[in-house]
Amino acid sequence: MESKNNYYNKLLNTIDYYGLKVNHVKNKEFIMLSTLERECHRSGSTIDKFFYLMEDKEYKITPEEALDNLPLPLIMKAVDSIRKEKNISKRSLSKSIEMDRANYQKYYKSKGSINFSSFTRILEALDVDLISFLERCREINNGNGMEIKEG
């Protein structure tokens, strides 16, 4: 239990550092976040647990970690949902992020997790911040129950 508390303290310190308003992540911090994210995967946390940690007052997880732990189909649904709501065509979104949809899906699938610096370009193209994006993921996830599966 001691090591788990250390882990949560690291999460808490990280979220305090970013103040839940992250515009960009420097490499050093991203490496730290990725390491914490891998520890989370090892402990077998679920999507619901990550959303809970995002809200909980005592233990918090960074927005980047939450994003990194969501299954790709949920992320893609949220991207499409925001794109349609803002009347952004697939073509203009692809141009903004300098890669086509098939390529960025393949990129995420082959890497197994989100490359945050690449994903920032998608958020910019959608003109939405990461917290709002995660809220959309939560809405979609809650609307569909647990039907969304990875892969």
Show the residue positions of the predicted features.
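DNA-contacting interfaces and partner/effector-binding or oligomerization modules
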Residues: 1-20
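Residues that mark the N-terminal boundary/hinge immediately upstream of a DNA-recognition element
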Residues: 10, 19-21, 32, 46-49, ...
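Short alpha-helical DNA-recognition segment
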Residues: 17-38, 87-106
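Short, basic-rich loop-to-helix N-cap that marks the start of a DNA-contacting helix
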Residues: 30-54, 111-124
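Short, charged recognition helix plus adjacent turn
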Residues: 38, 52-74, 78-84, 134-151
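Conserved small-residue-rich
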Residues: 71-131
